């Protein structure tokens, strides 16, 4: 497929006849938890005992991740908004798998689908890895599979920012009046290895820049709503991996402890790095970060995520319209946006050089280790299951690589569930 682009990486005037919602996936019940975790960690030698330890986090929630029901709700809202355009859903690590979604699109006669990834920021695990998953799905489905184009990142789009502002304002309102005006805003996103963060975007460093840009715009608009300027910072959650690998800091728990030690009396945790209340939010933030704050005497509230806010759903529809029409407005609320439509060659690539779909055609060519042995979809087995068994470089951002019991704060998916 040749995607027309301009010098800024804008691919406009593309005729798409379907939307594919692309997400991480999660277990639907207790019997799914260990198979799901094996999918996520396949080929990395993680002991069963360590998987069982992390599975206990799901036990707190009945062995079921919230992410699937949230994606079903988003899917329903998108279908209503985009009708008669069909909307499909596929996951990286659990049913419905991406390959199955692509196969359904082929059976339905879809020629080209726009792909909306539930990750707002540039990184390997939040963007390029999904494109690699799409490439694996296309290879698995084979001839007749639809062309795929990825919708741009939305970290500073009004449809993402404005709901987050409202959630911040509501969270502030739940704090005691005596400390409300001095509350700090702690914007949280998934931790990444510093090397991966440095490689994010076409020129490097995009993940941190985009996070700061989104946080700054949200904080500014919160101040306009409440009449008080709240100090803010970015912190990270869900780190995993060996301590020898440098990761982005500070951890949200360390940030909250430092605020309390410095005399702060209240904070609002703002999960800007996540679009729904999945496991990292309901466990890493609602359980562990809230416990850290409470132990330090810090009044704390957690802002909501965008979920199925009508403005967010409308944003997805607008992103589709952007790709279909060269004249469609491309709103962005920070100097970092709007993001490119078509990911440049090797964008967000940490060096593995694996084929990636939905970008420039050259990125779909094999650059690195072979991807042989990809076969038809099987229950409990993602389309890219074979990839990690052919000597590929280890991705330190993948969950559960730290085998020391108790050192990972959660299941720690690199881009969120």
Spans of features found by a protein language model:
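Intrinsic disorder/low-complexity segments
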Residues: 378-380, 384, 405
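Active-site-proximal alpha-helix that buttresses catalytic centers in soluble enzyme cores
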Residues: 2-375, 400, 417
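Short, intrinsically disordered C-terminal tails of secreted or membrane-associated proteins
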Residues: 407-416
């Amino acid at each position: 497929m040749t995607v027309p682009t301009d010098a800024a990486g804008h691919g406009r005037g593309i005729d798409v006849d379907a939307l594919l919602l692309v997400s991480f996936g999660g277990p639907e019940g207790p019997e799914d938890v260990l198979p799901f975790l094996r999918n996520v960690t396949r080929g990395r030698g993680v002991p069963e005992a360590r998987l069982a330890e992390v599975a206990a986090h799901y036990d707190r929630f009945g062995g079921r991740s919230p992410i699937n029901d949230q994606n079903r709700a988003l899917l329903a809202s998108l279908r209503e908004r985009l009708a008669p355009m069909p909307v499909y859903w596929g996951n990286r690590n659990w049913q419905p798998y991406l390959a199955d979604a692509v196969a359904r699109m082929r059976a339905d006669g879809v020629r080209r689908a726009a792909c909306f990834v539930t990750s707002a920021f540039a990184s390997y695990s939040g963007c390029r890895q999904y494109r690699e998953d799409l490439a694996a799905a296309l290879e698995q489905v084979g001839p007749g599979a639809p062309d795929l184009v990825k919708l741009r990142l939305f970290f500073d789009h009004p449809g993402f920012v404005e709901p987050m502002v409202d959630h911040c304002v509501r969270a502030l309102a739940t704090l005691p009046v005596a400390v409300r005006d001095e509350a700090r805003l702690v914007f949280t996103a998934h931790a990444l290895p510093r090397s991966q963060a440095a490689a994010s975007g076409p020129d490097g460093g995009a993940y941190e820049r985009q996070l700061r840009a989104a946080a700054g715009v949200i904080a500014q608009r919160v101040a306009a709503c409440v009449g008080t300027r709240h100090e803010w910072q970015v912190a990270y959650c869900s780190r995993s991996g060996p301590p020898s690998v440098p990761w982005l800091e500070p951890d949200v728990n360390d940030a909250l402890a430092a605020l309390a030690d410095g005399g702060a009396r209240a904070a609002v945790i703002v999960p800007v790095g996540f679009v729904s209340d999945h496991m990292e939010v309901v466990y890493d933030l609602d359980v562990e970060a809230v416990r850290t704050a409470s132990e330090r005497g810090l009044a704390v509230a957690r802002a909501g995520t965008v979920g199925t806010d009508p403005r967010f759903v409308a944003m997805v529809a607008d992103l589709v319209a952007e790709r279909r029409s060269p004249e469609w407005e491309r709103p962005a609320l920070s100097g970092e946006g709007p993001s490119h439509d078509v990911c440049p060659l090797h964008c967000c690539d940490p060096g593995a050089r694996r084929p990636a779909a939905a970008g420039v055609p050259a990125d779909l060519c094999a650059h690195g280790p072979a991807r042989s042995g990809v076969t038809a979809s099987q229950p409990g087995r993602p389309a890219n299951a074979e990839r990690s068994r052919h000597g590929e470089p280890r991705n330190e951002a993948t969950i559960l690589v730290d085998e020391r019991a108790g050192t990972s704060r959660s299941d720690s998916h690199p881009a969120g569930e």
